[in-house]
């Protein structure tokens, strides 16, 4: 693990400790008066790949969510200037990935979607990825417009609202999608156990015989 990754994990540990081990319901504990919003219930029959909005990735690519189909995805919604929950959410997604047996890892994509249409441009997201050593092919950071972001959040069950200071209150949620973009597992809260998410990913990969492709 390189120094950037170690630095990122240190930030996550500090943020997670300050923020608390599990604020999956409601919280008013950080210095920005951030409120954690509980996630909505969702249907596991709906695919996010039916959404036709356009996104820009941190590498400058324009894509739709359907371009991700064919492999399981670990997805979370964050914003780049968040210094409390969001770094922990990113690290939680990485914890899921790193807990997979190595032969499964190349069949999984990690996708971070920003709430912050104004500040999290593709360039800003690329800088975020570079800063924390998240620039390899497994990671995709996405920027979209307000309607596109809202539609995705609704299907994922992520609640968020923009505050007067430009920051966001939001749900802390890491979601596992199957190859067709349907929800198969969710982790709500911060620094939560990842075993169920890992098992869900392995099942998707095995059921679709992806190891043999």
Regions found by a protein language model. Name each.
Residues 1-7:
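Bacterial N-terminal signal peptides that target proteins for export
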Residues 15-17:
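N-terminal signal peptide c-region/cleavage motif recognized by signal peptidases
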Residues 21-37, 213:
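Histidine-centered metal-binding segments
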Residues 32-66, 91:
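N-terminal "domain-start" segment that seeds a small globular fold
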Residues 50-51, 73, 171-173:
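Short loop/turn microsegments at loop-to-beta-strand junctions
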């Amino acid at each position: 693990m390189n120094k950037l990754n170690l630095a990122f994990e240190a930030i996550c540990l500090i943020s997670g400790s300050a923020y608390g081990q599990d604020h999956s319901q409601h919280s008013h504990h950080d210095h920005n008066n951030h409120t954690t919003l509980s996630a909505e219930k969702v249907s596991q029959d709906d695919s996010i790949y039916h959404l036709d909005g356009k996104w820009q990735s941190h590498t400058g690519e324009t894509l739709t969510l359907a371009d991700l189909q064919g492999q399981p995805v670990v997805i979370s919604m964050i914003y780049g200037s968040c210094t409390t929950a969001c770094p922990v959410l990113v690290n939680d997604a990485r914890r899921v990935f790193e807990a997979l047996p190595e032969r499964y890892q190349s069949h999984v994509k990690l996708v971070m979607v920003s709430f912050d249409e104004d500040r999290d441009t593709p360039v800003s997201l690329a800088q975020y990825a570079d800063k924390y050593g998240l620039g390899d092919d497994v990671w995709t950071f996405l920027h979209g417009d307000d309607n596109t972001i809202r539609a995705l959040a609704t299907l994922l069950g992520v609640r968020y609202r923009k505050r007067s200071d430009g920051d966001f209150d939001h749900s802390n949620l890491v979601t596992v999608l199957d190859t067709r973009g349907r929800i198969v597992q969710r982790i709500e809260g911060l620094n939560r156990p990842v075993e169920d998410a890992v098992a869900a990913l392995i099942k998707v990969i095995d059921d679709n015989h992806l190891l043999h492709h």
